[in-house]
Amino acid sequence: IRDSDYIMALVTTTEMFKKAYEGGYAIGAFNVNNMEIVQGITEACAENKAPVILQVSAGARKYANHTYLVKLVEAAMIEHPEIPMALHLDHGDTFELCKDCVDGGFSSVMIDGSHHDYEDNVALTKKVVEYAHAHGAVVEGELGRLAGIEDDVNVSAEDASYTNPAQVQDFVERTAVDSLAIAIG
């Protein structure tokens, strides 16, 4: 996507968040896993002249593979070049997956190291940030885990933990993440 001259380039979530903050509006982030969902979301965004974050979850990766989903987003960008779009990996759990998505054209990845202890989460997140930033992508980290099931990730009540506010500044400074998902209930 980045090298194509016939479609608008993906934007990063950092660019979107800055404009939204300055403009006082929210940005929709939607998990996508097939052509019809991508079409419906981008057509609605075009009608409303709204930027959009298209996310690829673990379930979508199992169903369609992120490589196929990149091509669907490329098609949406050809159809609607006027819409700022970010392609975001949602809850990536390994460096290798994040690297594959960055290499495949994603403008943003989330590394969810919340299943690790704090120091391992910091190390993993920092490694992803270093790679992604070197390749023009941005990174969302995660601190804390909510109980429940999202896609195939089942977090028991015993393993759940809210984000410790005392760790936030240290985590952001040590990892250089661009955004942070927190668990507050």
Tell me the role of every PLM-derived stretch.
Residues 8-28:
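N-terminal amphipathic alpha-helix/helix-capping segment at the start of soluble metabolic enzymes
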Residues 13-19, 34-60, 67-82, 92-185:
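Alpha/beta enzyme core
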Residues 7, 31-32, 88-89, 119:
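Residue-level marker of alpha-helix boundaries and capping positions
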Residues 27-31, 86-88, 110:
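Short catalytic-loop micro-motif centered on adjacent basic/acidic residues
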